[in-house]
């Protein structure tokens, strides 16, 4: 997800320290898992969400995070590229720099 690419580096005097102090774990999800999470939120809950905000959902759906008890994640959509979102929810390929995320129709 494009908006996850910056802002928390070691030189960032605010975000890095806050993340270091408050995070329990860090999990890496793939662009394909983000793609799928965007589809799930749209088709299951009718939520239009940007890629960066669905990483928590992607981690759960992929089995990389196994929630125990009530679990929450923040879902936003303000920085959403609607053309890209339309490609995702309609199962089309998405080009991210030099990488192509192969489209897949939801539910298949």
Predicted segments — roles?
Residues 12-68:
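Active-site-adjacent helical/loop segments in soluble small-molecule enzymes
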Residues 1-6, 13-14:
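Anionic-ligand binding region
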Residues 55-108:
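Phosphate-binding loop/pocket of nucleotide- and phosphate-handling active sites
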Residues 4, 8, 32-34, 53-55, ...:
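Glycine-rich beta-alpha junction loops
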Residues 5, 9, 90-93:
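A generic structural signal for secondary-structure junctions
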Residues 1, 26, 45-46, 72, ...:
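Generic secondary-structure boundary/loop-capping signal
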């Amino acid at each position: 997800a494009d908006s996850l690419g910056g802002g928390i580096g070691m030189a960032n005097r605010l975000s890095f320290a806050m993340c270091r102090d408050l995070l329990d774990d860090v999990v890496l999800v793939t662009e394909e898992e983000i793609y799928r999470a965007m589809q799930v939120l749209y088709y299951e809950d009718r939520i239009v969400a940007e890629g960066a905000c669905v990483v928590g959902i992607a981690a759960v759906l992929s089995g990389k995070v196994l929630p125990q008890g009530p679990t929450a994640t923040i879902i936003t959509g303000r920085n959403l590229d609607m053309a890209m979102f339309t490609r995702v929810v309609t199962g089309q390929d998405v080009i991210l720099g030099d990488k192509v995320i192969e489209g897949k129709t939801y539910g298949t």
